[in-house]
């Protein structure tokens, strides 16, 4: 396969905390449709792939612009299956060239085409490394609290008790939205972050987690303001 970019969306049918999350309505469209629609708007992404174990998701994916739907093996569709093995399985199924950029884009990645394009450009500048989407922690880790016995709490550490928060280092987290690297890099690695990687800094609205039911309306509101109403 000789294309500029292959976008692979891993979408399991099961979801423990938000049932049927990837098929759930998100501002009027199934969740999985959102990243597919963003990819369709980018000319260099000529192959939009969905790896799934679920017939309904496969149907929605095709209706939303997926060019290929891969039947994911049961052993790669468990709660404990990692992302890298799923993407490597898809790469093998597709016969993707080693030099092709492969982007893993999660169904909950409600990103604009502009953000996705920026991540791809960053990956082209760093052909031998992973590009990983990251968000910024809004509160310093040095001020984390921990529960004690009974009803009490304390600082997890008092090392920076008197340090001003603005003087503490900014920390980041893996946003779990997208990962990009050449196919050869995916094939050679067990995970995306076992070695130093190139961060792709997401704005706060794009890095919001969608793991609990209460996260859903917050993510929808942010998506309406920063994507739907600004386009």
Where are these regions (language model features)?
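N-terminal nucleotide-binding beta1-loop-alpha1 segment
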Residues: 1-19
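Conserved SAM-binding loop
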Residues: 24-25, 50, 103, 208
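Short active-site oxyanion
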Residues: 44-49, 130, 205-206
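A short, N-terminal amphipathic alpha-helix
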Residues: 31-47, 59-64
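Short phosphate-binding loop-to-helix
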Residues: 49, 56-102, 110-111, 118
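Conserved core of the sugar-phosphate nucleotidyltransferase
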Residues: 85, 109-196
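Conserved alpha/beta core of the MobA/IspD/sugar-nucleotide pyrophosphorylase nucleotidyltransferase superfamily
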Residues: 171-231
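Hydrophobic targeting segments
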Residues: 4-9, 32, 47-50
